[in-house]
């Protein structure tokens, strides 16, 4: 009897570096068309700065920033930053999001993402036994004067990857 062996797995895709990802985002059609510009992603994935520039084609009916653009400028960054910092042993997904429009946005607005070691330690500890964690990350979109235009929260699902043959009984969520 001949044993059937599975074909070898392709090598994992090498992780992209922050500088390359920043350039890719700036030419990504959804960001390019809406005026979103990623101005900085730190080399350690702990900080990012994103701007939304007012353009004739991205104004809403009353001449201010379209709310969907304010929301989309914040979309992938927390997930990517946490995923890159925790590494390949973790699953990280966007789970939920909330936005509160505080005042009309005009001109260039920006949002900053800062991920500190304490948050990463908290996530690592909370997922050590294989449980999923649902963690909220707040951020403010501000105008050139520093006034808050919108307050947002993104919820991430974070879980340590199961080893082969693991059970699905570890789905109780921890909410830090």
Where do the PLM segments sit?
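A generic structural signal for short beta-strands and their flanking turns/coil linkers
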Residues: 34, 46-48, 93-97, 107-111, ...
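Short, charged/polar surface micro-motifs in flexible loops or helix N-caps
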Residues: 44, 55-58, 76-78, 117-120
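Hot-dog-fold acyl-thioester-processing enzymes
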Residues: 57-77, 91
């Amino acid at each position: 009897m001949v044993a059937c062996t599975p074909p070898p797995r392709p090598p994992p895709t090498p992780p992209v570096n922050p500088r390359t990802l920043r350039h890719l985002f700036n030419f990504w059609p959804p960001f390019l068309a809406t005026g979103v510009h990623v101005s900085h992603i730190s080399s350690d994935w702990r900080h990012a700065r994103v701007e939304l520039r007012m353009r004739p084609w991205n104004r809403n009916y009353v001449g201010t920033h379209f709310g969907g653009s304010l929301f989309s400028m914040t979309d992938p960054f927390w997930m990517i930053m946490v995923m890159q910092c925790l590494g390949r042993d973790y699953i990280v997904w966007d789970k939920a999001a909330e936005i509160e429009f505080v005042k009309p946005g005009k001109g260039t607005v920006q949002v900053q993402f800062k991920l500190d070691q304490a948050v990463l330690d908290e996530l690592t500890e909370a997922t050590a036994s294989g449980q999923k964690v649902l963690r909220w990350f707040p951020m403010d979109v501000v105008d050139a004067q520093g006034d808050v235009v919108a307050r947002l929260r993104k919820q991430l699902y974070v879980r340590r990857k199961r080893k082969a043959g693991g059970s699905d009984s570890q789905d109780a969520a921890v909410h830090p």
